[in-house]
Amino acid sequence: YKVTFVRNVTDIDDKILDKAAAAGQQWWERAYIYEREFTEAYNTLGVEPPTYEPRATGHMIDMIDLIKQIIDNGHGYVVTDENGNPTGNVYFDVASWPHYGELTHQKQTAVADAASEVADAMGPSVDNAGNDKYNPVDPADMSEDKHDPRDFALWKAPKDSDPLDARWNTPFGTGRPGWHIECSAMSHRYLKDM
């Protein structure tokens, strides 16, 4: 078999921006350091090189187009301010996809509520720090903008601390890609005809 090996490079995300700021570096400089270290580790292990190795920042148009398609298909929503202007946040609406969570065994609301009752019968579900032991939600994923806490970011409005060159203008506001859309857009670009 002829294998097409795509190894995408996430060169823009919250962690890269935060680590770069803490180190006094440009975000793209920090991303390149991580990419180089990863490639060296792969080479040390003798792993075959990829057929394609796209960087997320080189595929912004692909990501924006895919987000538009997701919104047009009723699976995403743009957050707007009180005047109806887009804020830059776009989320995937998990409730719009009936099979969402099947692969990872996550439950939709009604089933999750029933599971919560069972968990409550098992004892306290919240630990001393206030974290839900049975259904943890990353605090970074919590937002009043979301319809459901499980909705995930397709596009993120910039934080005040984000550098100006880490922001892209889109029909849904200025921001940068969410982590999941990067992989999806690049996979579609390089593997759609496979």
Which residues are covered by each model-predicted region?
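NTP-dependent nucleotidyl-transfer catalytic core
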Residues: 1-194
